[in-house]
């Protein structure tokens, strides 16, 4: 779905209206979802993919944040980045927490690629989205469990980035928490890549 969202955003261009973005994202996600129906989607999303007239279903799941990374790269202001992230979430995850998770993730990516420090990213996310980023990974590990909500995935993924030394370390941090590790890893790595760059060995 990350590819589907990125492809849709590039197709409509940087000045597209919110409605145009939402329509393109919904079309592309359905297209990719139907082509790859066994990719481990959640139950409601699987049904959404098949709908002739898909509607948002109030989800606050972490899928909205997992797929949003392109929004953090394609726009020249954090306000536009957040507007587009909100639009990509709204086609399915129109619960306030689902939208917030997508906006926070895209904002962190935008700031990371534009040279903000970890402290600046942390302060912005805490102020704008009211996530508690003061916790440590060591503390989180003592109680963390498998959970798929934005509000219990996105802050932890950002903390995994904040405590990291490089891209690979960020992913190791995320996976070390357990729980929904593929989503944690995807969110954390999307921020880490913007901050550290792509490791040379992967280029």
Residue ranges and their predicted role:
Residues 1-203:
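Structured, active/binding-site neighborhoods that engage oxygen-rich ligands
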């Amino acid at each position: 779905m990350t590819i589907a969202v990125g492809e849709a955003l590039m197709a409509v261009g940087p000045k597209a209206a919110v409605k145009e973005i939402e329509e393109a994202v919904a079309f592309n996600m359905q297209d990719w979802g139907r082509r790859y129906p066994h990719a481990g989607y959640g139950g409601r999303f699987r049904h959404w993919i098949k709908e002739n007239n898909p509607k948002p279903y109030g989800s606050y799941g972490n899928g909205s944040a997992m797929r949003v990374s392109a929004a953090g790269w394609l726009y020249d202001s954090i306000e536009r980045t957040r507007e587009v992230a909100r639009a990509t979430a709204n086609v399915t995850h129109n619960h306030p927490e689902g939208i917030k998770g997508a906006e926070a993730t895209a904002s962190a990516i935008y700031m990371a690629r534009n040279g903000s420090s970890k402290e600046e990213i942390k302060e912005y996310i805490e102020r704008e989205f009211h996530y508690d980023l003061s916790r440590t990974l060591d503390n989180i590990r003592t109680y963390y469990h498998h959970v798929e909500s934005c509000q219990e995935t996105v802050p932890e993924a950002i903390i995994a980035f904040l405590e990291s030394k490089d891209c690979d370390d960020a992913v190791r941090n995320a996976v070390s928490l357990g729980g929904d590790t593929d989503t944690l890893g995807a969110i954390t790595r999307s921020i880490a890549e913007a901050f550290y760059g792509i490791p040379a060995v992967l280029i």
